[in-house]
A protein has these predicted regions:
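Bacterial Sec-dependent N-terminal signal peptides
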Residues: 1-31
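Surface-exposed acidic loop/strand-edge motifs in secreted or periplasmic proteins
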Residues: 31-146
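Extracytoplasmic electrostatic interaction patches
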Residues: 128-182
Length: 182
């Protein structure tokens, strides 16, 4: 009986120790979403001081700056926005291919990614005293550095050009705009 008790104890310990090393999906996801540094190089982005002539970006806003930790938070929110946009695009693509089987497509042209773009960040304090930022993405700088001092505005071009607004207080994004295709 003593051997049986030791055997049961060993079996229980091995079961408990195996179970203790498992991570559930939420734990894995939180580890993957942990970002401790902003990884863009200075040649890929610029933080621009808001100019009241850019009234179409924000109304009644005041210029402000961005901290390293805010850039990291923005990156997390951007990843969420990209994932949600691309899921919506996939749903639309499936619906299109089902409705028009003779015109199958593999992408909508509005799928997005974060890598491979230049970025312009325009941070402001809005009327409510909340920090917001408009981020402009573009895959072609046309061989100049003008984009570091002037807002890059391009018509058409599809998912090569898009922009988004993020409210850092509420941690929400809005007004995701993706250029159309001519």
């Amino acid at each position: 009986t003593k051997i049986l008790k030791v055997l049961i104890f060993l079996i229980l310990m091995s079961i408990l120790s195996c179970n203790g090393s498992k991570k559930n999906a939420n734990e894995i996801k939180s580890v993957e979403n942990t970002q401790t540094e902003f990884k863009l190089t200075e040649s890929d982005f610029v933080i621009m001081t808001f100019n009241s002539e850019w009234y179409w970006l924000f109304k009644n806003a005041k210029p402000t700056e961005l901290t390293q930790s805010e850039l990291i938070e923005i990156e997390k929110i951007l990843k969420t926005a990209i994932i949600e946009n691309n899921k919506e695009q996939k749903v639309g693509l499936i619906a299109h291919n089902k409705k028009y089987p003779e015109y199958q497509q593999t992408e909508t042209g509005f799928e997005l990614k974060l890598d491979g773009y230049k970025r312009q960040y325009v941070p402001v304090i809005n009327e409510k005293g909340e920090k917001e930022v408009w981020i402009n993405f573009f895959c072609d700088d046309f061989g100049t550095n003008d984009w570091k001092t002037e807002i890059a505005l391009v018509e058409d071009g599809g998912n090569c050009y898009y922009n988004i607004k993020i409210n850092l207080k509420t941690k929400e994004y809005y007004e995701l705009g993706i250029n159309g295709n001519a």
